């Protein structure tokens, strides 16, 4: 049976920024909202692949953050973006979904954590390749990102080459850091997914988030995994979807691992199986 043609919807945030969003209808009361990483868009292949895979388990809403893709405004690198996520979550409620989870990648992970900790209204939260703190420059990739957003030439290149419009104003007030926000998410279930080959944020960021958070929480350190959307193979996407489905069931107080690790695997590590070419960052 052929799926219906997907059409985009324009949602408007409380500060009047138009947000380009799409909805892949599900067959249950569960919706997964995808929050993409910096310089990406719901139309980019890695994001679209994950959206379609999640759609086998749940309804899916994905969108472009401000300053990205077909949305308006300028990117504030995670500060005002919680308003973007808020309008999409509200839209999911309007569509009739009773269980709503947000899955964020990299920058999107920091936004999902801050939204869940400061605003609330989610039934489960997943952070994939997210930072534990701001201003991290400990890797070459993150030093490049800082040059791209802090310098005028960097912002120009980012706009023209990566189709991402970054605000030149910076943060007037430093937003609540991701780890501090993670501490406020309980009793909503939280899953932290991170690769041990992440070239942007090393695993210490995932551990920082996990240590700050309260139960119920889980940490999956994935051997061989790199960074964010491009590093998520089909097996991992399916495992996250199963965790979300179990975590949001009303009769289950504490979610269990969708695929528990074997006896030779540490309790906070989940082995990677059947890696695909998509696993390259």
Model-derived regions: residue spans:
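The serine-hydrolase catalytic nucleophile loop
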Residues: 38-51
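Conserved alpha/beta-hydrolase
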Residues: 51-72
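Alpha/beta-hydrolase active-site loop
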Residues: 76-95
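Short beta-strand/loop motif that positions the catalytic acidic residue
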Residues: 185-186, 192-194
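Conserved alpha/beta-hydrolase "acid-adjacent" motif
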Residues: 199-205
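Catalytic histidine-centered segment of alpha/beta-hydrolase-like enzymes
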Residues: 225-235
